Amino acid sequence: DAILVGDEAKIREIAAGLNMDLSDYEIINEPDMIEASLKAVKLAHDGRADMYMKGLIDSKNFLKSVLNKEVGLRTGGTLSHVCVFEIPGIDRLLFLTDVAFMTYPTLEEKVQIIKNTIPVCNACGVAEPKVAPLAAVEVVNPKMPVTVDAAELTKMCEEGQIPGCIVDGPLSLDLAIDPEAAKHKGATDRKIQGDADVLLFPDIHAG
C-alpha cells in the first residue's frame, strides 16, 4: 500500500502515462513540494505510514522535512545514509554507507553508522552482515587515519561493542567484494575475503 502526497493532477497524469491504476491508493493533494514533503513525513511521524520515500524533491528539502522538530523523524541518534545495490555478478546485496549525509565521520560516528546499517541488512535477509571499513590499503598506517579507525572498529566489534555484525578492516575495495582478489592477495586470515555485505566508506568523497 502507498499514500501519494503531491500535486494530484500531476500524479494522475503520470499514472495514466504508466497505465497505473490508482484506485487502491490514497492521494493527498498538495501542489507545493515542500509542504507535500512535510505532510508526507508527518504520516510516518504519526504512524500512518511505515516509510517516508523521497520523490522529485531536492535532498536539502527532503532532509529538512526529516529533521523538522514538530513532524520529523528525529530519534536523538546519528542520522546516516544507506544505499542498497543489487549488482550483476555479485551473489548478494551490497550495502554502501555513508555516501550522502556524513562528510567526515569521526570514529564514534562510524560506530553509529554501522549500528544504523545492521537493521537495514536484517530487514533484507542478512542476519549477521560482514562490514568492511574501506581504505586504500589493508594494513594500519598511522599516517593514514582511516586505517587506524578501521582497525579500532574491528577491535570494538571483537570486544562486543558493535554487536550483530562482523567487522574487518582496514580493507581495500577489491579485498572487500572480490573473492578472487582476496585469494590472489593471500588474505586467508581475514574474516572478510571478498564477501563483505557492508562497505563503510571513510568519507563522503570516497563514497
Regions found by a protein language model. Give the residues of each.
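Anion-binding alpha/beta catalytic cores of soluble intermediary-metabolism enzymes, centered on
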Residues: 1-192, 196-202, 206-207
